[in-house]
Amino acid sequence: MSPSSPAPTAATPAAQAPFTAERWQQFWKAWKAQPQQLEGIEQLRQAVIAADQALLTEAAPWRQTFSSSPAPETSAHANPLPVAWENQNDNASGTGYRECFSSSCAMLARYWGKVGSDDEYNAIRAKYGDSTSAEAQLSALRSLGLTANFATNGDRAALEQQINLGRPVAVGWLHHGSVSAPSGGGHWSVVIGFTEAVSIHNDPNGEADLVAGGYTANTNGAGQHYSWKNWQPRWEADGPGAGWLLTCQP
């Protein structure tokens, strides 16, 4: 090197773009608390402190977000579901007063595009047995190409899960007697949605009086808001997790 030659300088690394979000997450997915990882994360901590100490405090926005509760899962389906209401009391059979189960199952079948009315469904169900028979209802629904199941271990979580999956549910409950002592042979309606305070029903018999028992009206039972407080004891009359329900899907 001649006296006039410039002194060599250290090579400057080429400027690099910051990590992408995906690349950044890869580091934490590979985290196993190994010694070299612990050393690397400490180097990162010291570098962040040198740049801005406020970033590593409990009050830092990222720290608050990181420790916050996850947002509740949202359903891809409407709540309440768009289920057409059927009135059991105008059934062509002339015995609609005892056909709440059939009219409720008809709402399920109609929702899935298998029938156009409860009278159409009732004619199919009659081939398999009486309206009060769960087996007759299951056979009728299955004959329409639907997967149908009856259970007596339902609870609120099961109903909400079905609604979130886009499936209305037929439910059997005691509509007579006071809410503290429900009684009677039972009634069927269709849960089409829910909120924190209420279950939303298409009730084929109209609007129920959940406190005293019976019905306040037998006209339009579409979208009735039945409070969990007063309806759930009528549904789970035999104890928690003892609700009768019929689920249905293609």
Language-model segment annotations:
Residues 99, 103-107, 136-143, 158, ...:
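Extracytoplasmic/secreted proteins, especially bacterial periplasmic and envelope-associated proteins
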Residues 6, 10-130, 249-250:
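Active-site-adjacent structural segments surrounding the nucleophilic cysteine of cysteine proteases
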Residues 107-111, 115, 140-147, 162-166:
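Structured segments of extracytoplasmic/periplasmic soluble domains
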Residues 125-141:
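Short, surface-exposed acidic-centric catalytic microdomains
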Residues 93-102, 130-134, 152, 156, ...:
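Solvent-exposed, acidic/flexible segments
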Residues 152-210:
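Active-site-adjacent substructure of cysteine-protease-like catalytic cores
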Residues 51, 79, 194-250:
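Noncatalytic regulatory segments and standalone regulatory/sensor domains
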